[in-house]
Amino acid sequence: MHRVFISYHHRLDQGYKDALCRWNEQHHIFIDESVYDGDIDDTNMTDDDIRKAIRDNNLRKSTVTLLLVGQQTQYRKHVDWELYSSMYDAPINHRSGIVVIMLPTTGCKCTFAGHDGEIYSVFRGTDWQTNNLLATNSDYQNHFPYLPNRIIVNLMQGAKISIINWDDLTPSRLTTLIDNAYNDKDNTTYIFPKMRRYNYNPQ
């Protein structure tokens, strides 16, 4: 089993995170490393200071990040920091693989096969997409509503990130997605748009 960090909107999507952890306890899919020690006070911190704090503390033991995407996940600065830090390949704490889980609140119906063979091993029978089928930022937004821009711009550059819907999860599918993310994490090149420094609350 791989060590996994779960990134999500704590106020709105805690119930899904708790449900995923209970499900994992039943099926023994991953080792949960998502310890939450409270928000980081980023006053007077540079982007690199934040990245080091997240990577060296919150993500230190994990090798794969599971991102739970709800309607407001993309607006949370701490989620953006966790994604940035997961993608960053530091000398001591190396980059992580990433798997995206679209929550029912997004209304998403599509999946994304980010790794070789997943169309058949994971996404057979679903409305799957690949980089060959999506060309623009708008294409990704239309197929995957509420997906954070940091994920979109990296998918557009060919990053090996898979996307599955909450309702399509099975133990075998999630195990395969985590394994693939781990196995390809050192073969993925990420790009790093500027980190979000403020939360935005549309509602």
What is the predicted role of each segment?
Residues 1-64, 92-94, 173-203:
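Conserved N-terminal substructure of TIR/SEFIR domains
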Residues 3, 16, 108-203:
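C-terminal interaction surface of TIR/SEFIR-family domains
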Residues 11-15, 72-75, 106-108:
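Short acidic, S/G/P-rich loop/turn micro-motifs used as interaction or catalytic elements
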Residues 22-24, 82-86, 117:
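Glycine-rich, phosphate-binding/catalytic loops in enzymes
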Residues 33-36, 68-70, 103:
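Short loop/turn segments at strand-loop or loop-helix junctions that form parts
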Residues 72-89:
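Conserved TIR/SEFIR loop-to-helix hotspot centered on a Trp-containing motif
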Residues 95-102:
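Conserved beta-strand/loop subsegment of P-loop NTPase cores
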